[in-house]
Amino acid sequence: MTFWERERVAKLIRFHGLPAWFWKKKRMDYDLIRAAEVVSLRLLYLLAKADARGRISEEPGELEEHGELFADYGKELGIWEKPFDFANSYTRYQYFHKEEMLPKAVLYDNTEFDVWMMAGIPLAGKDTWIEKNGGGRPVISLDGIREELGVSPKDGSGKVVNLAISRARMLLRKKEPFIWNATNLTQEIRQRLCGLFTGYGARVHIMYLEAPYEEILKRNQIRTRQIPEPVLEKMIDKLEMPEPWEGYEVSYKIDGDF
């Protein structure tokens, strides 16, 4: 199974209940448009239809009716088989990060410079990507700061992150492009950083890297400071796949596709 096939199945499982209950959502348009960023609404509809028809129920037709409403609304929004067609990437980013905004709005892009945020478990190839594509830009690396300070990865004091953010602010104030190099495994962490960077007028590009598990283990064996396998497993369990709406651009570099 390829990366894309795996993610398609994962998103169908995650959003499988949306056709039945979308109409109860507070921001109905928003939830459907956000879902359409990562999954085909047509496939969700077919999955929900099969689910409804396979149930033993006193009112088997109710879920199917909800599914038909879902299909009609998805088609009306123009997201039946593709993501919403925003006016530009700036408008798209703002739509997904503001409380209330019409998707058909046209906003002027006032970003001034670019910031790249790396994401992925250790040994996925982030450093290699930076070497090949960084273009000499400043790199703020949490691992690098740990080595600089002689701080153990187990140290939870926050001094490494605080210093990294302090250095990032210096570059942000100067509107200087840079690369933020860390695992950034959860959506919460990525969105907190996006909020910081965009607050200074940056366009944030998220670069997610992934390598086969066997390759990760092989690389770990030749690493100077090896990561215990249980720690790697915990990080994989913790990983939340970056979604296209999280940044101005989200790229997926799989199996060394740099």
Give a label for each model feature.
Residues 1-68:
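Divalent metal-dependent catalytic cores for phosphoryl transfer on phosphate-bearing substrates
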Residues 75-110:
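N-terminal pre-Walker A segment at the start of P-loop NTPase domains
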Residues 106, 110-116, 174-176:
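Pre-Walker A (Motif I) flank of P-loop NTPase domains
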Residues 116-119, 124, 136, 213-258:
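Conserved GTP-binding G-domain of TRAFAC-class P-loop NTPases and closely related GTPase folds
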Residues 127-178, 213-217:
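Conserved substrate/cofactor phosphate-moiety recognition/catalytic segment
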Residues 178-182, 206:
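Short catalytic-loop micro-motif centered on adjacent basic/acidic residues
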